[in-house]
Structures are given as C-alpha cells and as structure tokens.
Amino acid sequence: GTFYSLNTFYIASPDKDNSKTLNKALADGKNILFTPGIYNIEETLKVTKKDTIIYGMGLATLEASKGNVVMNVSDEDGIKVCGLLFDAGEKESTTLLQVGDKKTKVSHGNNPLSFSDVYFRVGGGKYAGKVKNCVTINSNNVIGDNFWVWRADHSTNVGWDVNTATNGIIINGDNVTMYGLFVEHFKEYQTIWNGENGKLFFYQSELPYDVPKQKAYKSHNGKVNGYASIKVADSVKKFESYGIGVYCYNRDSDIDITSAVEVPDRKGVKLHNTCTVKLNGQGQISHIINKSGTATENLGDACRIREYENGIIIQ
C-alpha cells in the first residue's frame, strides 16, 4: 500500500461543510476525508485533479438535495473514491456519480481511476428519491470494487411511480473492470454496458418486485417482455463476465421476462457461469442469455449456463 499523510486531507464534517467548502478544498488540491454523517449536497462536487483521494468513514452519505449530480469525477489519472453512500433526493437527478464528462480515447491504463465500496440508494429512507440513472462511467480504464446500486423495494417512500429510477449503472468507457457489482430493482435495464473490453467478476441482480402489469415492463419498443438485467450493447466486440446471477420475485403481477442477460452473439463476447433463480411470486424468467437457457417457472428454480459465446452454450 501507499502511505498518505493526514495533512493532505481536508477533514469534512456534516455539521460545518457544504458544497462550497468541499469544492474549495478540492480546488486547493486537497484529498477529502468524510467523517460519518449525512451531507446535503446542493451543488455538484467536482473532483478535477489527478490522484485525488475521496474517502468516506462510517458510510458517510452524500445526498442530492436539489436534483443535482452529487459528484463529477474528471477524466484524470489515479482518482480514488471509496466508502460513500450516494442518496437520491426528492427532485430527480440525471445521475448521482458521473465519471468523465463524455466518452474519449484517453487511456488511464498505467494509473486507473478506482471506486471501492460505493453505494447508491433511491428511496426507502427520508425521501422518495428520484434519479434517471445512478452511475454513469464515461472514462476508460476504470476499476470498480463492490458497488451496491439499489432502488428501494421496501420501507418508506417506495412505489413504482414513487421512487422512480430508470437504470442503475451505464458504462460507456472502454477497458472497465468491475469486481462485485450489485444492481437491483430499477425500472428498465439494471446495467447497460456500452464500452469495449469490459470485464465483470461477480454480478448479482434482483429485477423489480413492484411491476404493476406486463404492459409497463416491455423492452425493445414494447416488442419484448421485460428488461434484461444486463444489456451489453449490440456494437460491443469484446466483453467477458464471470459469475452472473439474476433473480426474480414478481410480487405484484404475473410478469414474464424474456431474457436475464442480453449480449451480441459474436466471438469475443464470453460469459462464464450465468444463472437465474425464481425467488418467489408469479411469472418467470424465460431464458438466461438471449434466447438460450431454460425458464425459471417454479419457486426455487435455478437455471444455469456454464459457458456462452456467439450463441453456443455449454450447460
């Protein structure tokens, strides 16, 4: 590991700090250490300098209080963010964490950006949170380790038209690697992966419990039942996953989900050990990957594909 003097950090406290004080510290070249508590973020926190460290203690919570992006991380080498909960506010945000303003050809292969133990919540607490998409990754060579991205399915301020959130995470950058990605209960695709050469190690996803009717949950311009949990873009040439689990509990209606995972059928797009499980409720997941794999028709059904590439499966 690397030693960093505490003198290089601005020590943040929810009792004294706001977006202005935090952004000033960042502009001055300080790392940020968030002490435990809830921070009302009224303006986007701008992490613009390479090798900046943003570190949260005790699950420090950053709340979007005015429909803003909570944190924008610039397309710079070596930025590290860890130990934070991003909370959607009452007014809809476009995203809570944005990494890079847009897709570029800039490589960070020698000094990747990294995000560890970061959590995202939409509803289930003080507010009926609203966001279009929790996490947007545009930069290349990003490493993610333990992301929990959650639209609330229980507790207070929860409902299909209450705590609204379309997607959990959208990955546009190339050479992005995720270790332990958990994405649950969003209203359309949980995860959209548009970048090339993505690698995913362990993915867990529950589809939304609270779909009111099949008509409200159809993809591909209403032609396909349900939304896959992971949608790898048709344009992607290389992608590889190890250990995907997608779970359904259609609590409120009899819902069919055509596929748990959608990927382009071509060599170079490889999936290892993919499974679906019916936890409870009505309906089913009809296929595991695209139109391959058996349906989860009965309570407790677990269906698996051991290897998949270019439409060829090994059970």
Regions found by a protein language model. Name each.
Residues 1-315:
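Extracellular/periplasmic carbohydrate-active domains that bind, remodel
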